[in-house]
Curated annotation (Swiss-Prot):
Protein residues bound to NAD(+): 29-57, 99, 138
Organism: Sphyraena idiastes (Pelican barracuda)
Family of the protein in this entry: Belongs to the LDH/MDH superfamily. LDH family.
Active site: 193
The protein, known as: L-lactate dehydrogenase A chain
GO-annotated biological processes: lactate metabolic process
Length: 332
């Protein structure tokens, strides 16, 4: 008899039932691993699968996480370059993609990422046809559109991480300015993730008190408190972090885990995430932009009708037109 047989007396033969809350992260770069760790530390899955084309790095990352298994409640952590390892995932988070090279045009970068997605997305669909697809790779709004087109999934099952992080940065900086915790500072950044994001100043409030009623010039020219600088700091924040440490990872990883939590726990929480906005706020083209959305078990169940000022709506439409200009040139 083996040591195991001497130690353990089997009462019944266990039937494998598979994972109920399996999450896959595609891409084990800085963002992928920060997302994976954040998901594990929040105890959001009973199985975590990692996929990447770089086999040695993937194997090392999986081993590193497995060695910390004692400190986690996720029983199974697996990884492979073969997508069969992702089978029956409930949520698949895509962080893989090409990095922008010096002097490279945005359109060229997007097309390179489209070519990568042409391999990734069909493999995800093959092994997890009922999953919720969350795109994190940049430019996130265009790549969410690409993932939606390539997957053939209904729009409620394809979500972009969008401005969930931009809004978190906004609330953090607002909190610093007011000496309050970010959770007590309410404000939304919508539209395109990044440079042309739109701060909804008309909705900024603390404890239901609209800050724009206290300071009617908030976010506009002539504001002596220069609240406009808060949004500039949100936009510049990522560039600043990249300049200092070479990449962004932790905040986007936590943001991804926040979104995954709302889905797997069916929280019906409202998040600013990238979804198909054609027909909303004057947008005429088939583009994905961030608006407040309800996330739950089925994915994106509802969109909140925002009351935007004409200037805010104009910025949103301008963002949509810019994205469509890039999208219509893509070869899918």
């Amino acid at each position: 008899m083996s040591t195991k047989e001497k130690l353990i007396n089997h009462v019944m033969k266990e039937e494998p039932i598979g994972s109920r809350n399996k999450v896959t992260v595609v891409g084990v770069g800085m963002v992928g691993m920060a997302s994976a760790v954040s998901i594990l530390l929040k105890d959001l899955c009973d199985e975590l699968a990692l996929v990447d084309v770089m086999e040695d790095k993937l194997k090392g990352e999986v081993m590193d996480l497995q060695h910390g298994g004692l400190f986690l409640k996720t029983h199974k952590i697996v990884g492979d370059k073969d997508y069969s390892v992702t089978a029956n995932s409930r949520v698949v988070v895509v962080t893989a993609g090409a990095r922008q090279q010096e002097g490279e045009s945005r359109l060229n970068l997007v097309q390179r990422n489209v070519n990568i997605f042409k391999f990734i997305i069909p493999n995800i669909v093959k092994y997890s046809p009922n999953c919720i697809l969350m795109v994190v790779s940049n430019p996130v709004d265009i790549l969410t559109y690409v993932a939606w087109k390539l997957s053939g999934f209904p729009r409620h099952r394809v979500i972009g991480s969008g401005t969930n992080l931009d809004s978190a940065r906004f609330r953090h900086i607002m909190g610093e300015k007011l000496h309050l915790h970010p959770s007590s500072c309410h404000g939304w950044i919508v539209g395109e993730h990044g440079d042309s994001s739109v701060p909804v100043w008309s909705g900024v409030n603390v404890a239901g008190v609209s800050l724009q009623t206290l300071n009617p010039k908030m976010g506009a020219e002539g504001d002596t408190e220069n609240w406009k600088a808060v949004h500039k700091m949100v936009v510049d924040g990522a560039y600043e972090v990249i300049k200092l440490k070479g990449y962004t990872s932790w905040a986007i990883g936590m943001s991804v885990a926040d979104l995954v939590e709302s889905i797997v726990k069916n929280l019906h929480k409202v998040h600013p995430v990238s979804t198909l906005v054609k027909g909303m706020h004057g947008v005429k083209d088939e583009v994905f932009l961030s608006v407040p959305c309800v996330l739950g078990n089925s994915g994106l169940t509802d969109v909140i009708h925002m009351t935007l000022k004409p200037e805010e709506e104009k910025q949103l439409v301008k963002s949509a037109e810019t994205l469509w200009g890039v999208q219509k040139e893509l070869t899918l």
